[in-house]
């Protein structure tokens, strides 16, 4: 029987983690995403066109305030924490909540989630949301194009 997984996130790393680890894994079933930080994202679906063949209806996105109810309702085995810009205190509070509700609390490491480039790569990262990664990426891409390089930008999907 497939492990039932819920992914917590903020419309970023959560979708990346899904695509790199769970999307094509028949031994897991991602039953839901939860989200916070992004206005009006709850009650939407991660689209079937991005979710892949195992998820023909896409995956529902719920407000994170429903986490405990969702763990129980969907008999979740593992909750994957997929934020990258929150405090240690917040992470551990969520871990306690998840485990008290009966699920495992999972943090995916870089070896499981990093893309494996076959060409020279530049990564634009930041310590929190909204600090200018997109603008910086455009500037770096422009400079590389001006230097005669072929440039491709890779970004996680947004529903």
What are the functions of these language-model segments?
Residues 113-159:
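Walker A (P-loop) phosphate-binding motif
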Residues 13, 84-86, 129:
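Short glycine-rich anion-binding loops that position phosphate/pyrophosphate groups of nucleotides
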Residues 2-76:
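A solvent-exposed beta-alpha-beta segment
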Residues 30-31, 105, 149-151:
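Hydrophobic anchor at the start of a short beta-strand
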Residues 19, 91-92, 137:
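Conserved strand-to-helix beginnings and helix N-cap segments that scaffold or border functional pockets
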Residues 10, 35-36, 110, 127, ...:
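Cofactor-binding loop segments of dinucleotide-utilizing enzymes, especially the Rossmann-like FAD-
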Residues 48-111:
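Phosphate-bearing ligand-interacting subdomains
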């Amino acid at each position: 029987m497939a492990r039932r997984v819920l992914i917590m996130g903020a419309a970023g790393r959560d979708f990346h983690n899904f695509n790199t680890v769970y999307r094509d894994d028949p031994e897991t079933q991602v039953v839901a995403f939860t989200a916070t930080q992004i206005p009006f994202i709850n009650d939407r679906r991660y689209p079937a066109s991005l979710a892949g063949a195992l998820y023909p209806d896409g995956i529902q996105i719920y407000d994170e305030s429903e986490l405990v109810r969702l763990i129980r309702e969907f008999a979740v085995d593992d909750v994957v924490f997929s934020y990258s810009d929150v405090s240690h205190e917040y992470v551990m509070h969520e871990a306690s909540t998840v485990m008290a509700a009966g699920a495992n609390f999972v943090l995916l490491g870089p070896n499981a989630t990093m893309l494996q480039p076959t060409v020279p790569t530049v990564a634009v990262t930041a310590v929190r949301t909204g600090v200018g990664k997109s603008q910086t990426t455009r500037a770096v891409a422009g400079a590389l194009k001006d230097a005669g390089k072929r440039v491709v930008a890779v970004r996680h999907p947004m529903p």
